[in-house]
Amino acid sequence: MKILSAEQIRELDKYTIEHEPVASIVLMERAANKLTTTLTDGYIRKNDNIIIICGMGNNGGDGLAIARLLIQQGFLHVSAYIVRHAVQGSDDFEANEIRLKNIGGFRYIETEMQIPPIPADAVVIDALFGSGLNRAAEGISAQVIRAINQSGAVVFSVDVPSGLYCDKPNSETDAIIKADVTFTFHAPKLCFMFPNNGQYVGWFRVLDIGLSKDFSNSQTTRYSYITQQTIDSIIKTRGKFSHKGTYGHALVCAGSYGKVGAAVLSVGAALRSGAGLVSTLVPDCGYEIMQSSCPEAMVHTQADKEQDELFNVEVKRNKGHLSLGYIHHLDLNKFSSIGVGPGIGTEKDSFEFLESLFRKYNKPMVIDADALNIIAEHDKIKAMIPKGSILTPHPGEFKRLVGEWSDDLDKLELQARFAKKHGVVVVLKGAHTSVATPEGYIYFNSTGNPGMAKGGSGDVLTGVLTALLAQGYTPARAAAIGVYIHGAAGDLAAEQQSQTGIIASDIIANLPKAFKQFE
């Protein structure tokens, strides 16, 4: 699903009006009907005190139409207010102003004294400003926004929380509605993906109001939203006559003394994500744990002294961390993909291991956790990252890789720049995890929940991605499928248990169910 700019959204409306064809006032009525139907399906009740705050543009026209429809449906306490922030409203706004006046009326807000009391048990429908806003709310509009935010009432925003820019970050001092739910039309807006805007957008729902899909699909944009339909179009089905060799051999390099659990989680996730064979390379201290925890995986550890002599190498032996002694005897080319980093530590031995791994293996890898921290500390090894690799930092790890950023949009630019410079896919983990490709595209994930913000969740993602790479997916597609499936499994776990109570192992347990929806 493409994420369009405010200008593209205006052109989309215009194209739909001209080519459907449909009158703009009819399109506004369609949007109001859709939103009203959604609101009455569990969000509001007939006896609620509903306060609708309208601007004088088309967003305000939507609000006036919603007020009229609710009154016509028998809602008992609907009050509509028009904030006089302009001399004249849009044509469709004025048409709906007349329609509402004929059945119920409204009041104007021109001064602070005219702002109505907003009880904490009221429901506010925010239709003040829409996606076309290009300057900060000020004057009476800002005063109304602050009054709504201070009221404690439940707030539902129409299309975009009023005061929020569609395509760029706001200033910290801007007056912006803090919505509980935002009902947006056609597709999410870029601003919904910014972490700093979570306090304003709340949860959002996308409503289809029949805007032209042909026009939307023809638009060029670097931003997209990963949905179930996206994954359904790119995920492969397993062939009747396929065998384990068809689905690749994944190797997970993970764990250290006290952190073998990271390896258990990554390997367990890889086993549940479709790879034909899964091997793991762990320190000696993790051998028995891995053998008993993941019997389906093949476990490799440190070369013995005879192997050292056979390969004519002399290495320091380390039972607690991966080091050079763990890699020289392995034929890495037999692996279809390698995932590295969870729990390996950042000691000198770990650095030498990672450097040697990058020298010996030139296929795309999944690079996470401590491997990213090692890369951040050594420019030499940063230049050695195999092209096409998938890097999976959380914000702290990403900051160590690229430095500080000024705002959420700047962070996305740094993510895209790093992906292009190094020829890698960067998966920046968090709410609406973003996937940046070397070609400059950025995809945002639609699945996942705050319950997944716990230790081990990232290790699970590493295993999922490594398994998908092993199956022959391109790095970009592996990343898109991986973050979606990972989040979907977390959603299933939270639904069965709770966001508070789920742990990383619960995500692994639900991976098969997440994949099942595509079979």
Regions found by a protein language model. Give the residues of each.
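Gly/Ser-rich phosphate-binding catalytic loop and adjacent alpha/beta segment
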Residues: A65-D121
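Amphipathic alpha-helical segments in well-structured domains
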Residues: E97, S141-I145, A179, L354, ...
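Internal gly/pro-rich beta-alpha loop/helix module
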Residues: D121-V123, L128-T221
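Small/polar-residue-rich loop-to-helix segments that shape phosphate-bearing ligand pockets
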Residues: N96-E97, A122-A127, N333-P342
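Small-residue (G/A/S/T)-rich helix-start motifs and N-terminal tracts that mark the onset
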Residues: M1-I82, S90, F192-M365, N373-L391, ...
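Phosphate/ribose-phosphate-bearing ligand recognition and processing surfaces
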Residues: N58-G61, A86, L133, S162
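Short, acidic/small-residue loops that bind anionic groups at enzyme active sites
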Residues: Y81, G139-P161, K360-H378
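Short gly/ser/thr-rich secondary-structure transition/capping motifs
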Residues: G105-E112, E138, G163-D167, I231-K236, ...
